[in-house]
């Protein structure tokens, strides 16, 4: 059975529990595992609190792999305060592997607020986004270590994901499919016969001849390349032999894949340059442009 087969099975299982949700949005899988471990009710939508505890109070989740730390992405113009409204506390969960929690801490919201306020007072950055880092030492000093039920290995959703993870390791060398974009990347690579490049600072995939490729994906027909600057944009595009735009019909079904020549993509990008230095720059091309300027290499029958 293929990686895609197990991912589709996981999607069906998640839909039975959370209809109309997309279980492959960033953070969903880990938050699902954490909510089950704590006996919380997960909010399957991206907006609002992450979950509700046994007292029906809103809580926020931050998850990270062992050796890393909790991160909080703040848009400076809007401030951090709005993210703390309606939340009683934050739970930090350390994962020892893709689907296994090793430790959970609870930190009260007043301590989170104080830390964020102090962090923001020290930064000189006035626009764009900033990451507030919560190091494990700070979490240990300010949080309470929580006993938890266990992990969600018995759920059909996680069981199917675990099967997909085994294939990801064996065939693509990917040790954690919960990372942002990984599932879609592997599904595309499976269609095109490519290998995955696991280093996030490099291209997304390569072929047997060493040619590199960038993968852009969309459900709505908008294909976005993120974090563009004058220093990196040409290298991010021109290092690739091709850019592939994969249109997803559902979160687990690719309807079409189009191949774009990097030089054509650069010509389109020229209309947006030079890139401003005071904000995060994302470059988007739409499905109509892709179809007019690309070559179709896969179409769902």
Task: Please give the residue ranges for each predicted region.
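Nucleic-acid endonuclease domains
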Residues: 1-301
């Amino acid at each position: 059975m293929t990686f895609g087969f197990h991912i589709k099975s996981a999607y069906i299982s998640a839909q039975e529990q959370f209809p109309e949700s997309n279980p492959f949005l960033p953070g969903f899988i880990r938050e699902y595992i954490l909510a089950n471990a704590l006996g919380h009710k997960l909010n399957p939508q991206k907006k609002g609190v992450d979950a509700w505890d046994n007292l029906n109070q809103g809580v926020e989740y931050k998850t990270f792999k062992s050796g890393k730390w909790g991160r909080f992405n703040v848009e400076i113009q809007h401030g951090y305060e709005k993210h703390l409204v309606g939340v009683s506390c934050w739970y930090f969960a350390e994962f020892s592997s893709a689907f296994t929690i090793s430790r959970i801490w609870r930190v009260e919201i007043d301590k989170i607020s104080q830390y964020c306020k102090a962090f923001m007072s020290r930064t000189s950055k006035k626009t764009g986004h900033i990451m507030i880092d919560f190091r494990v030492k700070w979490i240990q000093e300010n949080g309470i270590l929580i006993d938890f039920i266990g992990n969600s290995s018995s759920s059909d959703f996680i069981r199917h994901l675990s099967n997909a993870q085994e294939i990801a390791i064996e065939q693509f060398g990917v040790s954690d499919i919960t990372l942002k974009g990984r599932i879609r990347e592997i599904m595309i690579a499976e269609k095109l016969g490519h290998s995955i490049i696991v280093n996030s600072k490099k291209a997304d995939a390569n072929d047997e001849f060493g040619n590199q490729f960038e993968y852009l994906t969309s459900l709505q027909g908008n294909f976005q390349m993120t974090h563009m600057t004058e220093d990196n944009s040409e290298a991010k595009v021109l290092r690739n032999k091709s850019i592939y735009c994969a249109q997803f019909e559902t979160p687990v079904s690719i309807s079409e894949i189009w191949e774009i020549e990097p030089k054509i993509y650069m010509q389109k990008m020229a209309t947006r340059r030079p890139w401003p230095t005071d904000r995060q720059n994302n470059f988007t091309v739409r499905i109509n442009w892709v179809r007019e300027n690309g070559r179709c290499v896969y179409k769902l029958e």
